[in-house]
A protein has these predicted regions:
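Short S/T/G/P-rich N-terminal loop/turn motif that feeds into the first structured element of a domain
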Residues: 1-153
Length: 153
């Protein structure tokens, strides 16, 4: 099982490039402290125009250790100070979840992210279908992962 933290950041109009630069700096700091970090531009569907900063961890302990370490890093704190003085976007999250099937094997240049809402009682049937879906998607080099929130809001 692995864990994921996702921040959804919507840029203020005309501030996309500044926001991208800041998020790239933050992502690099997170990487230095143990996260497998990727920054993605949402190009279609719900949230188009925003950025998703995704961090992946092999264990919950690794996630907590990383959160504490990058939060204390002077480079991270500097970007947060700049953000407070000159905000260029709105941050939602992090959404924190655990992967119950699959996990990214590496960062990909394109990610297709779909959200489905299901009751916990439906998870066994979903997990039964996952290998079949993964087999279908392998022919187009798409990884399949299923995550559930650790905290429901």
């Amino acid at each position: 099982m692995s864990f994921v933290s996702i921040r959804e950041v919507t840029p203020h109009t005309g501030k996309e490039n500044i926001l991208r630069e800041r998020l790239q700096k933050i992502s690099a700091v997170m990487e230095e402290h143990g996260a497998k970090s990727g920054l993605y531009s949402v190009v279609a569907g719900d949230g188009a125009g925003r950025f998703d900063l995704q961090n992946w961890y092999p264990t919950l302990k690794a996630a907590v250790t990383s959160f504490q370490a990058y939060g204390a890093d002077p480079a991270y704190q500097e970007v947060m100070k700049i953000r407070a003085a000159d905000p260029v976007g709105e941050v939602e999250g992090p959404w924190i979840g655990r992967m119950i099937y699959g996990a990214p094997k590496g960062l990909k240049p394109v990610v297709m992210h779909r959200d489905y809402h299901a009751t916990r009682s439906a998870l066994p049937q979903i997990l039964d279908l996952a290998p079949k879906l993964e087999e279908l998607m392998a022919s187009v080099d798409v990884e399949v992962g299923i995550g559930v929130p650790m905290v429901s809001g």
